[in-house]
Amino acid sequence: QQGLYLPIVYNTSSYEKVETLRLLEGYVDIYLPDLKYVDSAISSRYSHAADYFTCASAAIAEMVRQVGEPEFVFERAAGKEGSSAEFPADEKKKISEQQNNMIFDAAEYQERSEAGEFLLMRKGVIVRHLVMPDCVEDSKRVISYLLKTYGGQIFISIMNQYTPLPQCREYPELSRRVTEAEYDAVVDYAIELGIENGFIQEGDVAEESFIPEFD
């Protein structure tokens, strides 16, 4: 109401009560939930939460209900200066007003991105999944569930940045990074299922710089 154009983003593990998320309705524009596991044995071992998938899947459903399918706008419509800066003030205002009224869906986002245009998400859900060592089959179950449940209603980010830390020494299978073969197997599976709205990570991105300072 007072001119704030930046979308409000909510970053979450998805291990949340639906009742809590309903309190956020109307305040959050973009949800960034994780969907870590489907297998209760894996979620119990690594997160002490046998009910993780039950809770997380219900939470994600509520997020999608709230914000709906993804929408994108030009970067300038989100409050940044862009290439219109070189135009006269009156022309720049006209361009800005036109772009503020242009909203793109996921398919149009893909097309314009490939053409070199830079769009920002205005609303939507991006579900993140971190591939972990020795968990390829469960990762496939995660991807399958998301695609069969939501299709093009969401974006899926398949992440390759798992970083082993000293605290994981009690789990020897987690003492290494995800191999290229493991990550590629998950990405290839998503492609086989027909994923359209997705993000992948290329190269070696497993670094401690991805881990926040929680202390």
Model-derived regions, located:
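Core AdoMet radical
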Residues: 1-21, 25-73, 200
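Auxiliary Fe-S-binding modules of radical SAM enzymes
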Residues: 71-215
